[in-house]
């Protein structure tokens, strides 16, 4: 427990003295690439013990054990020598570049071929965009020493560090734009619990960030592991894609900490694939994810999608990917912003028609706006659906802020217990009136598609929460609502014009 409370603070205090570290996001990135090498070195100990002729992809001199640790005389690299080694030897080689002295190659950059085992290939993909921000070799030495104190071959200490790593990920919520990579643990745990994982299934997250959904999935599934065969099924049950380098590094390190060795986590863009080219081999039993919304993608990305599904909103594009990559009889749980529910632009309407008309959208859970605070105050929702049949009816349930809170916050975040009422309701569904509103209600697919015209913003919050939106969030929400209102007006005008004797008004 001492490690949990002291580890992050010790490193933070050292890094604050280094002129190269600018803000929490850089501090965390700096910490995590070193953690990755330390954890990877511990894993290599296991692989060397259990595999015949195991050979590291990292050159011997550049393995953590041979440069980060003190030698037999207690001497360790430090100062300018350490800084020069990290910047001009370690990083270039791990990124795949040769290191030369004159015309002589001193170290070859690590090479990855199509047949390179995933557990080796992740070293290069993890370091492709990693950075060493520290400018002082003495402070760098001090941070390395703190990290090297952790004994990952000690089961109890390794388990305890899992909590430390979770705290590191939570800090991302207040580290500027990096917060977008972190979905609160309560949300990922609830979604994994409700999706009911089964051994033998394969689960995917196409924008996996730090690996929160994957970790929650593994946590639920691990309860079913009783032998080595089942453990292999667990290890093989995940698939993740992350476009951005920093969260990819966080996710891979997260998987190593959870003893997932042949981790199927890929550093690429899920949206850069023709939607209509997916085959059954590209589909999954379960999809759990929080698609990025309000993100920025090159306009060319829309070319990978049919015209009726093309959108500038990344959440819409990911919803289409999910629908095309969910196996027959598969299950999905997805976080979406309010804008997806009420939005009536062409893409959103067509996505919702496909979702309701071809899939079974059985449950929509409304979340309070402060669940993702302080990263965003935009209200989010959880969609639960399966690929078994078209929707006949959809239940909506509103999760309310506890009576003793005004809102959730960084210091008082949402916890799994705040879903207790929803979990109890889930297994015994009933309509719950709330004055002139409803906390829970069910609607037919016909009502959602025709009477509502695909506006499925139902069972919302009767009173605006006392929460001031971030200016960018406010702009984004008003833009969504303006688009929605314009679409509604166009629809009503078209219906009225159709009733006129002469048709369209000139």
Predicted segment positions?
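Helical mechanochemical/support elements of P-loop NTPase systems and associated helical scaffolds
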Residues: 7, 24-27, 139, 160, ...
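A short, mixed-charge helix-start or loop-turn motif at secondary-structure junctions
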Residues: 173-174, 234, 304-305
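Charged, amphipathic alpha-helical interaction segments
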Residues: 35, 222, 256-259, 327, ...
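A conserved structural/catalytic subdomain of Rossmann-like adenosyl-cofactor enzymes
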Residues: 267, 278-506
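Conserved S-adenosyl-L-methionine
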Residues: 177-289, 294-296, 312, 316, ...
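Non-catalytic, mostly N-terminal accessory regions of nucleic-acid modification and defense proteins
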Residues: 1-194, 198-199, 266-273, 366-370, ...
């Amino acid at each position: 427990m001492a490690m949990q409370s002291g580890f992050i603070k010790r490193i933070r205090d050292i890094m604050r003295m280094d002129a190269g570290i600018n803000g929490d996001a850089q501090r965390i990135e700096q910490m995590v690439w070193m953690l990755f090498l330390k954890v990877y070195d511990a894993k290599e100990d296991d692989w060397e013990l259990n595999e015949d002729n195991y050979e590291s992809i990292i050159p011997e001199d550049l393995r953590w054990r041979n440069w980060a640790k003190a030698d037999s005389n207690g001497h360790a690299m430090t100062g300018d020598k350490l800084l020069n080694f990290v910047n001009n030897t370690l990083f270039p080689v791990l990124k795949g570049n040769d290191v030369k002295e004159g015309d002589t190659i001193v170290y070859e950059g690590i090479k990855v071929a199509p047949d390179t085992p995933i557990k080796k290939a992740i070293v290069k993909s993890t370091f492709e965009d990693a950075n060493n921000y520290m400018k002082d070799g003495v402070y760098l030495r001090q941070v390395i020493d703190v990290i090297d104190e952790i004994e990952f071959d000690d089961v109890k200490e390794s388990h305890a560090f899992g909590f430390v790593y979770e705290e590191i990920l939570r800090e991302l919520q207040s580290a500027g734009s990096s917060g977008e990579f972190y979905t609160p643990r309560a949300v990922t745990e609830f979604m994994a619990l409700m999706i009911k994982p089964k051994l033998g299934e394969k689960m995917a997250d196409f924008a996996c960030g730090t690996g929160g959904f994957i970790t929650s999935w593994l946590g639920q599934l691990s309860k079913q592991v009783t032998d080595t065969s089942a453990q292999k099924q667990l290890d093989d049950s995940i698939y993740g894609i992350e476009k951005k380098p920093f969260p990819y590094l966080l996710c891979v390190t997260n998987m190593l900490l959870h003893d997932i060795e042949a981790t199927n986590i890929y550093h690429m863009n899920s949206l850069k694939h023709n939607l209509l080219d997916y085959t059954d081999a590209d589909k999954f039993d379960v999809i759990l994810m929080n698609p990025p919304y309000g993100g920025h993608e090159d306009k060319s990305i829309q070319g990978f999608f049919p015209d009726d599904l093309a959108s500038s909103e990344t959440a819409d594009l990911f919803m289409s990917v999910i629908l095309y990559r969910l196996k027959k009889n598969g299950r999905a749980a997805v976080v979406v912003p309010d804008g997806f529910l009420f939005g009536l632009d062409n893409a959103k309407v067509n996505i919702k028609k496909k979702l309701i008309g071809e899939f079974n959208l059985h449950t929509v859970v409304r979340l309070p706006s402060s669940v993702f605070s302080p990263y965003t105050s935009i209200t989010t929702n959880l969609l639960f659906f399966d690929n078994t049949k078209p929707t006949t009816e959809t239940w909506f349930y509103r999760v309310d802020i506890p009576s003793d809170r005004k809102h959730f916050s960084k210091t008082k975040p949402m916890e799994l217990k705040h879903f207790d009422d929803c979990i109890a309701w889930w297994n015994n569904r009933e309509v719950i009136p709330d004055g002139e509103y409803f906390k829970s209600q069910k609607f037919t697919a016909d009502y959602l598609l025709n009477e509502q015209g695909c506006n499925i913003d139902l069972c919302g919050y009767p009173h605006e929460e006392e929460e001031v939106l971030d200016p960018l969030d406010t702009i984004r929400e008003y833009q969504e609502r303006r688009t929605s209102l314009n679409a509604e007006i166009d629809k009503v005008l078209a219906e009225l014009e159709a009733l006129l004797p002469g048709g369209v008004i000139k």
